[in-house]
C-alpha cells in the first residue's frame, strides 16, 4: 500500500481553485454593460460622459513623483558637491601637501 505525504490532495485542491478562478475570469458575466435594475447599472456611454471623482488622479500621482524626484536629486547633488569642495583649512592641505613635494 502506498503512503501519501499530503501533497497530492494539496495539489488537487489548488488545481480546483485555479480552475474555478480561471473560469470566473474568462466568463462574460462580470463585464456586461447595459441597462439593468438599479442606479449602479449604467451603460458605458452614459458612464463615460459623467465626470468622475478620480479623473485627475494621474496628475496628482505625477506631481508627487516630481516632488520626490526633485527632493532626491537635490539631496544627491548637495552631497556630491559638498564632497568635491577642497577646504583650505583641511589638515592635508595645511601640513602634508606642501611637505610631500619637498621630499
Swiss-Prot record:
One of its GO terms (cellular component) is vesicle. Coiled coil: none annotated. Residues 78-103 are cytoplasmic. Residues 68-79 are annotated as: Interaction with KCNQ1. Residues 30-52 are annotated as: Disordered. It is a single-pass type I membrane protein. The keyword Iron does not apply. The chain crosses the membrane at residues 57-77. GO terms for biological process: intracellular chloride ion homeostasis; negative regulation of delayed rectifier potassium channel activity; negative regulation of membrane repolarization during ventricular cardiac muscle cell action potential; negative regulation of potassium ion export across plasma membrane; potassium ion transmembrane transport; regulation of heart rate by cardiac conduction; sodium ion transport. One of its GO terms (molecular function) is potassium channel regulator activity. Glycans are attached at residues 5, 22, 41. It is found in: Cell membrane; Cytoplasm; Perikaryon; Cell projection, Dendrite. InterPro entries: K_chnl_KCNE, K_chnl_volt-dep_bsu_KCNE3. Ancillary protein that functions as a regulatory subunit of the voltage-gated potassium (Kv) channel complex composed of pore-forming and potassium-conducting alpha subunits and of regulatory beta subunits. KCNE3 beta subunit modulates the gating kinetics and enhances stability of the channel complex. Alters the gating of the delayed rectifier Kv channel containing KCNB1 alpha subunit. Associates with KCNC4/Kv3.4 alpha subunit to form the subthreshold Kv channel in skeletal muscle and to establish the resting membrane potential (RMP) in muscle cells. This is Potassium voltage-gated channel subfamily E member 3. The lineage of its organism: Eukaryota, Metazoa, Chordata, Craniata, Vertebrata. The gene is Kcne3.
Amino acid at each position: 500500500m502506498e503512503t501519501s505525504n499530503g501533497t497530492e490532495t494539496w495539489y488537487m485542491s489548488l488545481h480546483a481553485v485555479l480552475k474555478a478562478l480561471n473560469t470566473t475570469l474568462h466568463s462574460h458575466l462580470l463585464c456586461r454593460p447595459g441597462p439593468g435594475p438599479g442606479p449602479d447599472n449604467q451603460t458605458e456611454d452614459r458612464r463615460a460622459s459623467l465626470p468622475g471623482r478620480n479623473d485627475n488622479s494621474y496628475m496628482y500621482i505625477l506631481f508627487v513623483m516630481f516632488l520626490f524626484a526633485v527632493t532626491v536629486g537635490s539631496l544627491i547633488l548637495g552631497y556630491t558637491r559638498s564632497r568635491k569642495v577642497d577646504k583650505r583649512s583641511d589638515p592635508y592641505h595645511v601640513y602634508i601637501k606642501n611637505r610631500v613635494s619637498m621630499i
